[in-house]
């Protein structure tokens, strides 16, 4: 999916960011009462890199980079610094969570590291969360504010895990939108029953 934040690489090599589409979507959801958490995806997206309009050439470019690489960290920090200022201006910082699709332990750790390196005006960092489809991330579950575990990879202790996380103010959900599971046209209630024994 294309990013709701439009990136432009200026002639001096720095990036600028246009949040118009993101703001519209967030405000539309808030208008309809969907306002507990803003989940921002794509900083560790499937395209492995950054898509931007190059001001010098007028073309759209893709710069390949993966979490943990120095260039990825540099660009991510530049983006997060600007994003955090924008979120503070809109009053959305405290309800925003950087999200990832299913990623490895090293990729997730890289995102946590870069997210913790960029602070807002009060010294706080953005929350981080993501979809989990294996127990590989278990050692860092407590560093993730919000995890959504794929139904097919639920640990045996899911109830205890969810309760422990809840006591720490962390969020745990289950997702069933994977191979052989609920499709978009299905009644949403069907997903709830799919995880019961």
What are these regions (language model features)?
Residues 1-122, 126, 131-144:
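Aromatic-lined carbohydrate-binding surfaces of glycoside hydrolases
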């Amino acid at each position: 999916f294309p990013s709701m934040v439009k990136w432009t690489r200026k002639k001096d090599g720095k990036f600028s960011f246009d949040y118009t589409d993101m703001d519209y979507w967030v405000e539309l959801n808030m208008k309809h009462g969907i306002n507990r958490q803003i989940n921002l995806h794509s900083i560790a997206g499937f395209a492995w890199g950054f898509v931007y309009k190059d001001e010098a050439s007028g073309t759209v470019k893709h710069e390949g980079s993966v979490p943990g690489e120095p260039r990825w960290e540099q660009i991510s920090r530049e983006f997060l610094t600007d994003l955090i200022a924008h979120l503070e201006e809109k009053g959305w910082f405290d309800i925003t969570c950087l999200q990832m699709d299913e990623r490895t332990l090293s990729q997730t750790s890289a995102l946590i590291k870069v997210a913790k390196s960029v602070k807002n005006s009060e010294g706080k960092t953005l929350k981080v969360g993501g979809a989990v489809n294996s127990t590989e991330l278990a050692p860092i579950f407590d560093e993730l504010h919000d995890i959504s575990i794929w139904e097919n990879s639920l640990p045996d202790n899911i109830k205890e895990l969810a309760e422990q996380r809840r006591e720490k103010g962390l969020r745990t959900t289950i997702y069933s939108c994977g191979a052989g599971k609920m499709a978009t046209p299905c009644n949403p209630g069907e997903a709830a029953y799919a995880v019961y024994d």
